[in-house]
Amino acid sequence: MIIFLDPHCVEYSSAGHPERPERIIRAVPLLKERHPTWEWRQPRAANDAELLRAHSRKHIEFIAKTAEDFDLDTPAHPNIDKYSRKSAGAAIEAARAALGGERAFSLMRPPGHHATRNRAMGFCYFSNIAIATLDALENGANRVAIWDFDAHHGNGTEEIVARNPNIAFASIHQSPAYPGTGLTSFANIDNYPVAPGMPRSEHVDVAERALQKLLQFKPDLLLVSAGFDAYSGDPLVQMTLEQEDFASLGEWLCKIDIPTAAVLEGGYSDELPELIDAFLTAWDPSS
């Protein structure tokens, strides 16, 4: 397993904001202690050409220059352009590592799956997973599948990749919940809205059905928007998954013979480090 991490990604914060540095700070020592053989790499920043595959130049410039918050959830932190480019770069590098035969996980912030082509929102500035997907298609992959099991709909990813015949996207998310999208499926987009409080077993079944549908696409690469906010103890939604359920998601990845990389999205409970570890350990049980 290769973990992509830039330690500077913990340098920004807002008082009381759930997308806080501790999400990473507490996960790093736990993973390093339990998995001493895993490789840790610092990512590079995504460049303009890579960002422009998913975003308009106006959006890229706005992220770099604005001093006003993008919305109530998405502050204009000092240097957020720098941190967001590193997070996008980590997703790109993780996808490329997967195409090279490695298992790879981007342990970075900010997350990305709510960022649309022209808008930062929902704690997200650049669409990391979409940027990585489009980069992969430019660098050897012919078909890429995206499996998003974050508790919130990946609306930004959907907007950017919709109707691209070389991409299949599936999102399993609570509904109703932020951002209020993802109710219908179309073209290359499969949405799986689940009700608040859905029994664990039913939620897991939906996630597996979504993954199996993606595998029918016969992708050269599977990218995972790994959000851990469907956990029963997460403060932002009302879902029911437990630690062992995230292990099940990882076990499924372990069993498929497709290059795979995952990117951290949400997850705001104090148990996030344990949830990440359960998922990664099941995905790479030899470590």
How would you describe each model-predicted region?
Residues 14, 92, 96, 106-255, ...:
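Conserved alpha-helical scaffold segments that buttress catalytic/binding sites
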